């Protein structure tokens, strides 16, 4: 009986070990199990030459995880930029670099993708995000405006533009008030300029902010409660 119990214990332990190893295998990318970026990229070349674009993209994604520098070099030197698969490979690198928080490189490859698909809204939104992360607020503003030309209900673009114009209005209003307070005895003309300046701020910046944020609440009314 003890022998049977021992055998059952060993069998259970072995099964748990096999289950753990299988789980680790599923969790780890193929490159972890010994394939270098160069090996994977060689397979990418073969897949591309055989017209297996989906498989090539999958391998290319693994190669980026195994060695982003080698994979990027492969893109610049070995990929036909006029091919249908080229923007898909650029998108792989854009997403990879975004996840790695290399915003300059991510921006570069989103722009590369957008050369072929200039009206792709998700890519434009991601590009605008990278512009913000790179401190290019004005560029992000223009990109989000383009997004709304293609998708007027885009949540992220409406929120960004609403907040942008609201903060701009607050900044302009504060400057007008501070400058006016510096005048000891304002004339009627100076007062009129001050009032006209405030009117412009409320009409333009505050007005734009209100329009964008109201759009958010119209499309996503649940956000009002939040």
Segments the model singles out, each with a brief description of its role:
Residues 32-88:
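N-terminal leader/linker segments that initiate helical-solenoid repeat arrays
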Residues 73-87, 167-212:
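Short coil/linker segments at helix-helix boundaries
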Residues 76-78, 88-92, 126, 160:
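Canonical tetratricopeptide repeat
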Residues 65, 112-115, 146-149, 211, ...:
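Conserved structural position within tetratricopeptide repeats
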Residues 68, 84, 118, 152-153, ...:
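Short coil turns that delineate tetratricopeptide repeat
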Residues 72-74, 89, 123, 157, ...:
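TPR alpha-solenoid repeat register
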